[in-house]
Amino acid sequence: MFPHYNIIQNIEFGAERNKKNKNLTVHEVIKFLNLEHVKDKFPHQISSGEAQRASLARSLLSKPDLLLLDEPLSNVDQSFKEEIQVKLKQILTELKITTIIVTHDSYEAFYLGTKCGIILDGQLKQYDDPYNVYHFPNSVEVVNFLNRGILIPAKVTGENSLENYDLGTIKGNFIKHYPKGSDVQLLLQPEDLEHDDQSNLKLEVVDRKFRGTNFIYTLKTLSNLLIPVFVHSHHIHQHEVDEKFGIRRPINIDHIVCF
């Protein structure tokens, strides 16, 4: 931002560059980005999060043909970030601005993007819609980068089944064909296992994180695998660390991803 302009002058600079933009006003963008209380201040007088939002406001008002945003909300308080994400997505859609967003926050990418690209070591490893990137990662590298599950050893036992030493039989639809007897690495995501205290398959709870709408349990198997499992926070049977956690059998996964 220009240091000799106050915040509203900096934002208005974007509007002046595109006077034909009638869909979004300076007042509207200041309000939705919660900048009303700092609009008369200068850049050196505001926080990094406020400066980041002011820069975003100016960019939106200029209505470019292509907008590149590098970690646009990295300094925004978490309590306010989700609200901005909703409004930002709405504005980008309404103004039909083609936007490339660079972020390390996969959830932010999944929400804001119609397409997601995973870039590792300067190479584009996967480019697809967010659902497919999450549920059908195309390599171990992408799985490790997203960090939304664990790869466990298994043996293919049939067209729709495989076997794991700790979990037993797992059934589902293979995304890729593997001959019977193949040794594979199965992607197990936190939502793939269901809690059932009546089950004879019990795993030890080694960690529990409360995330508002759900708990994320980390369970240890006999072979010392650490498996994450989601459980809704309203679930009546909550478990503490060192307790046993039942896993429903048979284990059924909609789509089986292996490597």
Where are each of the predicted segments found?
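Non-catalytic connector elements of ABC transporters
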Residues: G149, N160-F259
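Long, contiguous hydrophobic alpha-helical segments, chiefly transmembrane helices and signal peptides
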Residues: M1, F145-L146, Y217
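C-terminal boundary and immediately downstream tail of ABC-type ATPase nucleotide-binding domains
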Residues: Y134-T157, L187
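Short, solvent-exposed coil/turn linker segments
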Residues: F42, I101, D129, P153, ...
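ABC ATPase nucleotide-binding domains
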Residues: P3-E141
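Short glycine-rich loop/turn motifs that provide flexible caps or phosphate-binding loops at active sites
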Residues: F13, S47-S48, L146, P153, ...
